[in-house]
Amino acid sequence: MKKTVLVDDRAIKEINKFPKAVRIKIRAYTDILKETGGLQKPFTKKLNTKLNLYEIRIKHKGTWRVFYAYCGKKEIIILSALHKKTQKTPLKEIRKAEKRLREYL
């Protein structure tokens, strides 16, 4: 089922700081989200939050994460992105994505 993918302006600024190869992978994954409505493991993971928050998982000279959520049946919102430097995703970054999601709900 085709979906519309919206990207938060703040997420665009974060993603634009990433290396070109990472941005290309993000674009490819968001295109798959548009066409199929979802991604499979290991490329995505649902986070254990009260909100339906997911992360796109990218490996390229490090680990990168892009947080997104489903908003209704037809929209996906890209909320934030980061270069992950620790094994566990920082809770601060998850909370930031949740806060941004609440702005859309």
Region locations from a protein language model:
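Basic, Lys/Arg-enriched alpha-helical interface segments
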Residues: M1-G62, G72-I76, K85-L105
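Short, surface-exposed beta-strand/loop micro-motifs that present aromatic residues
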Residues: R65-A69
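Residue-level signal for short, function-critical loop segments
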Residues: L82
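Conserved catalytic cores of phosphodiester-cleaving nucleases, focusing on short active-site segments
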Residues: L79
